[in-house]
């Protein structure tokens, strides 16, 4: 069996797989916890992750929400400046009406 060198692409792929599995595990835990209630044993590690105000990258969730909605984007179709929080809604209506 020949061994291939480790590349950035393979490391990135491994990182993505691990991140997806971690998020899936946390999601399963949350759904089980909400279904079973608080009667089960508590996992300190996962409870810390759930109660944290930071996302998986260590960034504050509230700051991300505010910074994303305060950004303005230019609509390619009609040329208007649209707030980030309303961009998807605008694009749906804008493309339906075919504004120019």
Swiss-Prot record:
Free-text comment on this protein's domains from its UniProt entry: The long N-terminal helix forms part of the 'assembly lobe' of the SAGA deubiquitination module.
Gene giving rise to this polypeptide: SGF11
Gene Ontology MF terms in the entry: transcription coactivator activity; zinc ion binding
Cellular localisation: Nucleus
Protein name as annotated: SAGA-associated factor 11
Subunit structure: Component of the 1.8 MDa SAGA transcription coactivator-HAT complex. SAGA is built of 5 distinct domains with specialized functions. Within the SAGA complex, SUS1, SGF11, SGF73 and UBP8 form an additional subcomplex of SAGA called the DUB module (deubiquitination module). Interacts directly with SGF73, SUS1 and UBP8.
InterPro entries: SAGA_su_Sgf11 (IPR013246)
GO biological process, one term: chromatin organization
């Amino acid at each position: 069996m020949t061994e291939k060198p480790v590349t950035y692409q393979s490391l990135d792929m491994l990182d993505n797989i691990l991140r997806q599995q971690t998020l899936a595990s946390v999601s399963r835990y949350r759904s089980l916890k909400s279904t079973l209630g608080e009667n089960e044993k508590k996992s300190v590690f996962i409870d810390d992750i759930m109660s944290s105000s930071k996302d998986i990258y260590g960034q504050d969730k509230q700051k991300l929400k505010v910074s994303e909605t305060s950004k303005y984007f230019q609509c390619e179709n009609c040329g208007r400046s649209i707030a980030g929080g309303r961009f998807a809604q605008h694009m749906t209506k804008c493309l339906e009406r075919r504004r120019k």
